[in-house]
């Protein structure tokens, strides 16, 4: 299912899948006819109790993402390991408030968290700040809008281009923006930051500068190349 021009969501049928938690990921390995192997990690996009979904962004000159976004066909088989990870996991039992800050496809694990939060009907307050280049680049744009309610606040910042009449943020995430959207340190939020390495490092530093304890800021990052 296409999310943007360069991003697709895949639903996978995995034999003996043990189930997963929001914030975990899987490793996918492809093997060519000559034996060459390439492996990449992808965040799980679906909530627990549902079919495994991955949202993949096409990376130019990538070794795995072109196959997953452009070549894969129903019935294809490949190696998958997972679910992997526990550090970046969030479950409703952990409470809130939640602050989720995403850069580009870093929003993928947050979809799983928000869908679980919405399904649980838990009144945990969640604030989502999603940074994208332009409005057409916003992954899960309609779905995030549909999830927004009294308990889930969704905000966007568009760093390169904005549609006519745009009245939201139009710059990179900075300390002032994070202070405006809250929650602040006094609320002791659980904070998750995901995106490209420079984005994650800048946001994490800004959050600590605002007074958030470093131990409360969980980060997951990916490099500018690969795929």
Stretches found by the model and what they are:
Residues 1-76, 132-134, 157-161:
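Ferredoxin-reductase
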Residues 124-227:
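Reductase modules of NAD(P)H-dependent flavoproteins
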């Amino acid at each position: 299912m296409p999310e943007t021009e360069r991003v697709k969501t895949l639903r996978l049928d995995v034999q003996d899948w043990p189930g997963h938690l929001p914030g975990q990921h899987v490793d996918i390995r492809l093997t060519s006819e000559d034996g060459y192997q390439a492996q990449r990690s992808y965040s799980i996009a679906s909530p627990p109790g549902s079919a495994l979904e991955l949202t993949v962004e096409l990376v130019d000159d990538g070794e795995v993402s072109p196959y997953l976004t452009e070549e894969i066909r129903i019935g294809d088989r490949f190696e998958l390991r997972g679910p992997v990870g526990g550090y970046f996991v969030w479950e409703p039992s952990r409470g809130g408030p939640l602050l989720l800050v995403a850069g580009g496809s870093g929003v993928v694990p947050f979809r799983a968290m928000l869908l679980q939060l919405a399904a649980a009907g838990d009144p945990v307050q969640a604030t989502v700040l999603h940074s994208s280049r332009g409005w057409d680049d916003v992954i899960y744009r309609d779905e995030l809008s549909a999830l927004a309610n009294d308990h889930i606040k969704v905000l966007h910042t568009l760093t390169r281009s904005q549609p006519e009449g745009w009245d939201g943020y139009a710059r990179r995430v900075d300390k002032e923006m994070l202070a405006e959207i809250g929650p602040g340190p006094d609320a002791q939020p659980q904070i998750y930051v995901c995106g490209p390495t420079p984005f994650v490092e800048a946001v994490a530093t800004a959050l600590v500068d605002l007074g958030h304890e470093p131990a409360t800021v969980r980060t997951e990052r990916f490099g500018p190349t690969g795929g």
